[in-house]
Structure formats: C-alpha cells, structure tokens
C-alpha cells in the first residue's frame, strides 16, 4: 500500500550546473549534494532501464522543512553514460502534453517578477486565476516545465482551493 509521495525527479545534462541554478534562481536548499552512483546497488535498481555501464549522478533539493520530513523533494538526475537526445523543438515534452513540477509561493506576482529579473523564461504571458489558484508556467534552462501557484487558502492543499 502506498503511504506518501516521496519525490519528483527532473533529468538534466549537468547536475552541478542544475543544482547551482535551482539554488540561485529558485532558492531551493541542497539536502543531498551531487553524488555519482555506479555500484552494484544502482545496477540492481536501474540496470534494466539504462544502458550499461549503469551510472546515475543525482542531488536532492527541497523547500523549508523538506529535509526534516525527508519527502516531497526535487531529485535532480543526470545519466552520465547514457546517450542523450535533444528535447522536441516544438516545446512539447511528451506527445500527451506537459509533464511538470508544481511549486507553491506566497506572492505569485512578486515571485514571477523576481524570477524574470533572474532571466527565467516564462511559458505563459501573465497570471491565471483558476479554481482558487493563481498560476503561471516557466521552464528551467534544460526545458523542464514548472507551474508556480499561489493558493487562495494557504492552509488547504492546492487541489482543494475552490
């Protein structure tokens, strides 16, 4: 039986560069610094998913007390030995829409302005108001998509705002 949601992972071509960006631009905190995993354990875990020799370089970042609770973190992953391919030119991440990471802030307009000043590329023109949320979409330098949300009722989960 499932008991919680542990993490969301995004893949990047350079973990160290991505960690610096997520710290400097989004203000995330490094919980587990970049480390290269290339032992028998990772081979048993992912050996059927990625080409040999299996290697994963990863870091874990969070917001607030994420490091205390251990879950609800962002895992940043690089597969240093797997051949990469460019993201689609049309911007779609999949044939079925946008896979994305949801982030919550307390002042969407101010947070968007701060991120724009840091050079973040937004995918939407402004801020939308939907079902009790204010939202805007952006991407990181590796074209991972994020939705930034401000909740009308901060004490409730994002999906219970209406």
Question: Residue ranges of each PLM-predicted region?
Answer:
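Short, solvent-exposed beta-strand edge segments and adjacent coil->beta transition regions
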Residues: 3-7, 96-100
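A cross-kingdom feature marking solvent-exposed beta-strand/loop segments within repeated
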Residues: 39-45, 84, 124, 128
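Active-site/binding-pocket entry motifs
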Residues: 67, 82-83, 154
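Unchanged
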Residues: 67, 76-77
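Vicinal oxygen chelate
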Residues: 10, 33, 60, 74, ...
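Core segments of cupin and vicinal oxygen chelate
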Residues: 11-70, 117, 137
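Short, small-residue-rich loop/turn micro-motifs
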Residues: 34, 78-80
């Amino acid at each position: 039986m499932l008991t919680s949601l542990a993490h969301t992972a995004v893949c990047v071509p350079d973990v160290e560069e991505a960690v610096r960006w997520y710290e400097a631009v989004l203000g995330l905190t490094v919980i587990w610094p970049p480390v290269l995993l290339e032992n028998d354990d990772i081979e048993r875990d992912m050996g059927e998913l990625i080409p040999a020799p299996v290697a994963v370089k990863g870091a874990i970042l969070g917001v607030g007390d994420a490091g205390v609770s251990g879950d609800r973190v962002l895992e940043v992953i690089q597969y240093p030995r797997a051949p990469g391919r460019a993201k689609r030119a049309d911007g779609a991440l999949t044939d079925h829409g946008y896979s994305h990471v949801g982030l919550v802030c307390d002042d969407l307009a101010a947070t968007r302005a701060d991120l724009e000043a840091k050079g973040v590329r937004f995918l939407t023109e402004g801020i939308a108001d939907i079902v009790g949320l204010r939202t805007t979409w952006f991407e990181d330098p590796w074209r991972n998509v994020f939705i930034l949300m401000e909740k009308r009722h901060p004490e409730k989960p994002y999906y219970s705002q209406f």
